[in-house]
Every structure is written in C-alpha cells, then in structure tokens.
Amino acid sequence: MVLQANTNKQSTFNLILYSKNLTKTMTPIQTNKMTNWRWVMCAMLFFATTVNYMDRQVLSLTWKDFISKDFHWTDDDYGTITAVFSIFYAFISLFAGKFIDWMGTKKGYIWAIVIWSLGACLHAACGWATFHLADTGWFGENVVKGTLMFTSISVYLFLACRIVLAMGEAGNFPAAIKVTAEYFPKKDRAYATSMFNAGSSVGALAAPLTIPILAAAMGWEVSFIIIGAIGFIWAAAWAFMYEHPHESNNVNEAELAYINSDEKQEEESTTSEDEGLQLTFGQCFTYRQTWAFIVGKALTDGVWWFFLFWAPAYFSELGYPSNTFTGQMLIFVLYLIVTVLSIYGGYLPKLFVENKGMNPYAGRMRAMLIFAFLPIFAMFAQPLAGVSVWLPCIIIGLAGAGHQAWSANLYSTIGDMFPKSAIATITGIGTMFGGLGSFLINKGSGKLFTYAEGQGDTFTFFGVTGKPAGYMIIFCYCAVAYLIAWTLMKMLVPKYKPIVE
C-alpha cells in the first residue's frame, strides 16, 4: 500500500511537472502571435468619421427640399451658413489639435464627439425656436412668416447650432491622426488613414439613403436628432475600449514591437525619441514642413467640402431633388465611387515603399501626384450634364475619390516628419487653413450662384450661361487645385526631412 501511494504521488507530481512544461512550451507561441488591436482602433476611427460626416450632411440633404420651404432660404443664405461653419471649424481647428495633445487622445476624443453630437441634435430645435421668437414679439412686434426678418431669425439660429457642431467636429481629425501615429508604424499609416478616412465617404454614402427618408417620414427635425444621437453611443464605446498601446491589455508584445518598429530603425541615427521632442505652438510655424501641409490643405479642402455641401443642391438644380429616388441614387452612386476608389489611396504609396524601396514621404508624394490628376475631370461635369445627369455624377465621384486618396496621404506626411507629441497640433493648424479655404469656396459659391441666376443669360463662362456658368467656374477651380498644391508642396519640401531638433 505504501509503495502504491508513493507511486501515485510520483505520478501526480510528474503530471503537474509535465503540465508546467507544456504551458511553458505553449506560452511563446501564444505570445509571438501578433494581436491586431490596432485595426480595432482603426475601425473605431472609421465609425467616428462616418458619424462625423453624417452629422455634417444632414443639413445639405434637407435644406433645399425641406427646410427652405419653411424659412424661404436662398442659395446665398445656405452659402452663409456653410461658410460660417467652415470659418469656425477653421478657427477651432487651430486649437483643437493642441487641446487633443494636452488632454490626451482618450479624453480629448470624447469631448469632441460629445460636443458635435450635441450640436447636431440642437438643429432640431431651430424650427420651433424660429416660430416662437417670431410670435412672441422678441423683435418689437410679431414677425410675419415668409418675411426677410423671419428668414433671418432661422438663419441665425442654424448658424449658432453649426458653430457648436464645428467646435466638436474640429477635433475629429487631429485625434484620429494622433491615434494612427500611436498605433501604426510609418509604412502603414497612409493605408490606415485611408481606411478610417473612408468613413467620410461612407457617411456621405449612407446619408442620402437615410436622411431624406427620415425627413420625409418624420420631419427634418427628427433626422437631426437620430443621426446626432449616434455619436453619444460611440463616445461610450471609446471610453471603454481605448488605451495607449503601451498600456492596453489587448496589445501583446509582438504587436507592440511592430508598432514601435520605426523607433528601432531610427535609434542609430538619433538619440531622442519621437515622443520626447516638444514643439511650442510658435515653433511649428518656423518649419517648411508645416507650411507644405498648410498649402496642401488650404488649396484642396474646399473642393471636398464643396462637393459635400453642394452636390445635393446641384442635382436638384438638374431636376433631381434629394426627396426623389433618382436624386438619392445620384448621391449614393457618387459616394460609392468615392468610397471604393479612395481605399486604394493608402495602398499605392505602400507599394512604392515596399517594391521600389522609396522612403515613406517620397512614396506618398509620388502617389499624391497621381491622385492630383483625377479631379481634372471635374471641368467636364457641367458641359456633360446636358447629355446625362449620370455623367457629372460619375465625374464628381472620380474627383472626390482623388481628393480622399490625396487627403489620406497628406495627413500621413505629418507623421513622417513631425514628432508624435506635435502631430495633433500640426493637424489642427493645417485643418484651420483648410477650413479657411472651404469658407472662401462655400461663401463664394453661394454668392456666385445667386448672382449668376439673377443675371440669367447675360452671365457666361466657357459657353455656359446663367447659374450653370457659376457651377462651371467652381468646377474648373476644383480641377486644377491639386496640381497647384502638389507643386507648391514639392517646392517647400523637395526631399524627406524629419524634424528631430
């Protein structure tokens, strides 16, 4: 019995020892298999950007066919609203990046999306507030519906809501670019940026299929509330899911080593880490790299915002308003083209880096030159509208895809040349100048279209008369903006030159 007991104890001991050895043998396999939490973060950025653009699109899809009927808006009124949004977006962007760097990615992003979601929902109260202010004698006497004063009240209320929306939305891209720099090595950043930036196209793609239907079924006010409320859900998920990769339990050592592969490659040529170099706000403006990014944003952002804000109104002018099936399909197909093609925006420079041996910045600049040629087709949109409305739809889609591919690489140039501690700040500075460019195009477009419509056939441009001539002028600018921007960027920063001191 004693011998049998000792034998059993020995067997048990051997089994425990074998289990421990087996565990030790398995652990390296489990550890070395790289996790992919960085792509979960990229998916979160994609959804945030989708919500961002859907909130921005609600007004452009409801003003012409729903809101203007209540308040008698003109193109100039709408142009003023979009221009003020652009200018406040630009102004807040100047500080949003610094705010994200100071607050931190997690808290800063939550603040941004909560503010813009609140601003989106507040639009729903503008109708009630306009009628209430008009009826209660706030302006000395009851304001008659349909008068200039009544219209002005509604415009100012929408302006206030757009300002709140702009305050929050200005933080989206600085935060997203900072997350991309935290979670991806340089060679993957353009691709990751193109993936989350596709959210802007998907948001614009989903908007015409949902917003006009909601507005027609339940009122334009409800469309603002439902779309705006989605942002609060995202904020709750972000608070639960995001941690810096060094602190995240969902990132193992293998993935962390891959994320930090840039630092390992560069430690022989520099003794300071990216995260450690601190740039003051004023110092950022002393670098040519900053001004290259500024030029790239200022000359091209307005093109995308023009397509975003004015495409539904343009198709409505051609006889296909957003509350018709064809009008909705035109916007859907336009942004479907943008979404599908823009994804390759980050893949092309990756091919240049891996197959041609180019550094990331050189690969991006070559890809951006290729993408800069796509918007040239925009100058043919208006002349071909008389043949078929689907031709300008496809052409604007190609131009929009060129912009999104360009934009993904433009944002990634920041991570190529600036320390991580300054990425959100530089993004905010560039976004501010992009917003200024958007202000000029949107306000100028509204003024131009109203003037051209009033002049009728006496207003001509390249053989096109009246209001269509106004669109022709803007389309021509859209066609050449990217080639001009690329040329100036190349003059400012001819070769890859990271900022290390």
What are these regions (language model features)?
Residues 362-409:
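C-terminal transmembrane helical hairpin of 12-TM major facilitator-type secondary transporters
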Residues 161-200:
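Cytoplasmic helix-loop-helix junction between adjacent transmembrane helices
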Residues 59-61, 287-342, 407, 411, ...:
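Extracytoplasmic gate region of multi-pass secondary transporters
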Residues 57, 86-94, 204-205, 335-343, ...:
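Residue-level signature of mid-helix packing/kink "hotspots" within the transmembrane helices
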Residues 91-131:
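Conserved MFS/SLC helix-loop-helix module at the cytosolic interface between two early adjacent transmembrane helices
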Residues 114-151, 369-386:
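C-terminal ends and interior cores of transmembrane alpha-helices
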Residues 237-242, 378-383, 471, 476-501:
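Multi-pass alpha-helical transporter architecture, strongest
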Residues 201-246:
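Helix-loop-helix hairpin linking two adjacent transmembrane segments in secondary transporters
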